[in-house]
Swiss-Prot record:
Name of this chain's protein: UDP-N-acetylglucosamine--N-acetylmuramyl-(pentapeptide) pyrophosphoryl-undecaprenol N-acetylglucosamine transferase
GO BP, sorted A to Z: carbohydrate metabolic process; cell division; cell wall organization; lipid glycosylation; peptidoglycan biosynthetic process; regulation of cell shape
Compartment(s) where it occurs, according to its Swiss-Prot or TrEMBL record: Cell inner membrane
GO cellular component terms attached to this protein's record: plasma membrane
E.C. numbers: 2.4.1.227
Pathway in which this enzyme or protein is active: Cell wall biogenesis; peptidoglycan biosynthesis
Annotated source species: Helicobacter hepaticus (strain ATCC 51449 / 3B1)
Length: 350
């Protein structure tokens, strides 16, 4: 039996879920150790993927100052002691951390109990916790470049449907704006500027603007007089079908989104979230754009001229779109979670 820990936000939790599902397929039992704060409970409370789920009283340390930081460190140490006892109780063979602040307790607990620790780093720049824990880990897995001696490159765990619904793009007919489930105001506002011109050029538009911004964006399109020409929606659980239909996507550059688009063969214009820790979204996107697989623009650089120059370069150069689409699909293989678990099995047997 092994333990999965970490989460807080959807990107980390999606990795945890992929690993748990793969383990369950192989009749491997696992427990989950997360936090009472963040999305951990929403995702896994009562989940049949795990034999037991524990949500410890822990919080993030990095963004705290003064007394708040001291309290957060104390909570993490208390959670680490609790996790140590949980690991012993279930005779856990190893711990897999998927990152995020809620991984702190069980990861430190693993070190305290001498339980092998494996880490998955989802971003191009290591999170603070993963940076601290790397020397103590048996291996660290990632899909971007890694510099540590114990780094093992694997495909990013992406759901099968992003591969099965993939296609090589030949022509640029349909553009998808992904403002995210929360709504990225910078992307949403830029869409309002550029969409009328895109429509004039014969490009059809779908726009996910997030629950919070849906009414404002809908009214704005109505005011411009193009609401009937734009497929505007707040959120769609079947986002894979939206990606499949698109020939180009303007989106943030969280790791999951990037690799899902890569698996799907969809080229992106990436607008990193400006307040992401260590600016990791910028470096995530840079991994792709330095290979010519997309365009990277800071929110402050978003303007129609830059975007249309990029669109025109894709339209004018014969085979440019299909070549990039092919290259994106070749960067990632299915079964990323299986690959990680196989590496762990091999390392544990030595």
């Amino acid at each position: 039996m092994f333990a999965i820990t970490g989460g807080g936000t959807g990107g980390h939790l999606a990795i945890a879920k992929a690993l748990a599902q793969e383990a369950q397929k192989n009749n491997q039992q696992s427990i989950y150790i997360g936090s009472q704060i963040g999305q951990d409970k929403t995702w896994f409370e009562g989940s049949s993927l795990f034999t037991h789920c524990y949500f410890l009283d822990s919080t993030g340390v990095v963004n705290k100052k003064g007394l708040g930081k001291i309290k957060a460190i104390f909570k993490q140490l208390k959670a680490a002691w609790e996790a140590r006892n949980i690991l012993k109780k279930h005779k856990i063979e190893y711990v897999i951390s998927v990152g995020g602040f809620s991984a702190g307790g069980a990861s430190i607990g693993a070190i305290l109990s001498n339980t092998p620790l494996f880490i998955h780093e989802q971003n191009a720049i290591k999170g603070k916790l993963n940076e601290i824990l790397t020397p103590f880990a048996k291996a660290i897995f990632g899909s971007f470049e890694g510099k540590s001696k114990n780094f093992i490159h694997t495909s990013y765990p992406v759901r099968d449907e992003f591969f099965t619904h993939s296609r090589v793009r030949e022509k640029l007919h349909h553009l998808l704006f992904l403002g995210g489930s929360q709504g990225a105001k910078g992307i949403n506002d830029f869409a309002l500027q550029i969409v009328p011109e895109l429509l004039k050029r014969g490009i059809t538009i779908a726009h996910q603007c997030g629950e919070r911004d849906f009414e404002r964006i809908k009214k704005a399109y109505e005011h411009i007089g193009i609401l009937d020409k734009v497929d505007v929606f707040a959120f769609d659980k079947e986002i894979v079908l939206r990606l499949q239909k698109a020939d180009l996507c303007i989106a943030r550059s969280g790791a999951s989104s990037l690799w899902e688009m890569s698996a799907n063969g969809l080229i992106g214009i990436f607008v990193p979230y400006p307040y992401a820790a260590k600016d990791h979204q910028y470096y995530n996107a840079l991994h792709f754009t330095k290979q010519g697989l997309g365009l990277l623009l800071r929110e402050s650089q978003l303007d129609m001229l830059r975007v249309f120059t990029f669109i025109e370069s894709l339209q004018k150069q014969e085979d440019s779109l299909s070549e990039k689409s092919h290259l994106l699909m070749s960067k990632i293989q299915p079964n990323g979670a299986k690959e990680i678990l196989e590496h762990i099995t091999s390392l544990m047997s030595h």
